[in-house]
Amino acid sequence: MKKIFDSQGWRWFVDNEGDLGGMWNLHTFYFRFLSPEKDVFQVYGVLNREISIDRLEEVRAFLMDWHLRKFWPKCEYRITDDGQIRVQAENSVHWEYGATDAQLLQQINCGIATTTDFFDKMIERLGL
């Protein structure tokens, strides 16, 4: 993966769990292989801000509307230990028979583009 990122001139980091990460539009993204066989590749983005728990119903309504209208990314929220809402989105593909660098790059670009679009629309709609 680092080779793909370097070929695009992207800045990246490796977190303390060994996941490859990067920043796009101030949002943090992680790129990782999942499953015991490491054949599911996931692009995972985290919204660049937390949202007040008072806005939970608005967040839920926005996510429901998004999922009714869009195939991806899969979007979700979590409540943090300090009672704030943390919004994430993911694009996962099962590459059971392998993938070329070009295929992985296409998934990365799709995951980043659709996730940043989701985040931008949520920020706009909720006035964040």
Whereabouts are the PLM-identified features?
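Flexible helix-coil linker/hinge segments at domain or subdomain boundaries
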Residues: 116-128
